[in-house]
Amino acid sequence: MTRRGEMLDDAWYMDYAAGTLKSEGEDVLVAAHVELSDEARGRVEELEKIGAALLMMAPENEPLPFTADDLLAAEGALAPLEVGDVTRHEAYVPQALGDFLQRIHKTIRWEFLGPGLNKAMLWTGPDGEKLWLLKAQPGVAIPQHGHNGSELTLVLKGSFWDGEQQFCPGDVEYADEAAAHDIRIDDGGECICLALTRGKLRYDNPILKLFQVFTGL
């Protein structure tokens, strides 16, 4: 599967809970996703509960007698975790992202990306990984594109459609090199997303390929 809407695979939540995600960019985006999504937060708490239970079963000073697959298999033995409602702030910037920007002394500066589109570059990793914001006006159709790498997209405000699937605040979409986006912003209001991109976007349109030199994406 090249794309999975709304939630990530469990491996992402396990790595987040264990503090073993691959980069600061992944840490920030997944933390923001968990902050905004009751379902994601509940999943992390379930996995933490499973891990804690299995750790208590491990003999002292011996290797852990279970693997990541064992954690997932043990899930059915535990009662479901109830997740209550969480008060949301009006601002579109989640605390996880705000804390990160404050720590690296970065402010959000919007730049023109195209008609009805603005971007704000936030962070670049040592391998060229980019964390950035996209702001799109209602009804805008984003040019069809693919990826020469991977991308995580988290909705902070508003909503968009990728093909027949809608993504709303707290939802996250993962795309790899096999995915092709056909994105349209909902008519109800502007949409702001946090994206983490590895590799450049891939366009078939030669004009967009030329414009890509100026966007840095």
Identify the meaning behind each predicted range.
Residues 179-203:
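Ligand-binding loop in jelly-roll beta-barrel domains
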